[in-house]
């Protein structure tokens, strides 16, 4: 992307047409830990949403110093900033949820955005992640609302 750095994306879609046992449905990957996971929805709780039809987009834009090089201290430390965008839409047909215990997106998108710094001590990464939708998501499994904001850390080596 030239001056904007490098972008990475992941598209996933799926349809489960026939009735199957619960473990074979799509249980979207959540992350309750303090560690950032590039392959999960980092503000979603484990087993929070289940779908038989879904589409997801996960996008990360590495700005390669576009903003941080304008700040002398950050430039000297060689930190890099990045932005993330995670989108998921899905649905669970009633025939898959006969007892009503499964929580579905019901066609309403799940969105989270994040920003952060990487290359801290050459391998650490810190992400600030915000959950934008499904903020009041209580069910029989979860008694409280999910968090709206979290700070996640991870280790990565980008050559």
Where are these regions (language model features)?
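Exposed, low-structure sequence patches enriched in small/polar residues
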Residues: 1-159
